[in-house]
Amino acid sequence: MSNTGTTGRIPLWLVATVAGLAVIALLGVFFYGSYSGLGSSL
């Protein structure tokens, strides 16, 4: 269970960071769309 043998595998912290940023971006877009009255374009 060492970090040196993770060749070919994506680090968990990188996955968590990208997923967290994607969720925050999606929530921001949805909230901004519903606030501006443009959220009904779905």
Curated annotation (Swiss-Prot):
Subcellular location: Plastid, Chloroplast thylakoid membrane
A single Gene Ontology CC term: chloroplast thylakoid membrane
Keywords per UniProt: Chloroplast, Membrane, Photosynthesis, Photosystem II, Plastid, Reaction center, Thylakoid, Transmembrane, Transmembrane helix
Coiled coil: none
UniProt membrane topology term: Single-pass membrane protein
InterPro entries: PSII_PsbJ, PSII_PsbJ_sf
BP GO terms, sorted: photosynthesis
Role this protein plays: One of the components of the core complex of photosystem II (PSII). PSII is a light-driven water:plastoquinone oxidoreductase that uses light energy to abstract electrons from H(2)O, generating O(2) and a proton gradient subsequently used for ATP formation. It consists of a core antenna complex that captures photons, and an electron transfer chain that converts photonic excitation into a charge separation.
Family: Belongs to the PsbJ family.
Quaternary context: PSII is composed of 1 copy each of membrane proteins PsbA, PsbB, PsbC, PsbD, PsbE, PsbF, PsbH, PsbI, PsbJ, PsbK, PsbL, PsbM, PsbT, PsbX, PsbY, PsbZ, Psb30/Ycf12, at least 3 peripheral proteins of the oxygen-evolving complex and a large number of cofactors. It forms dimeric complexes.
This protein's name: Photosystem II reaction center protein J
UniProt organism field: Chlorokybus atmophyticus
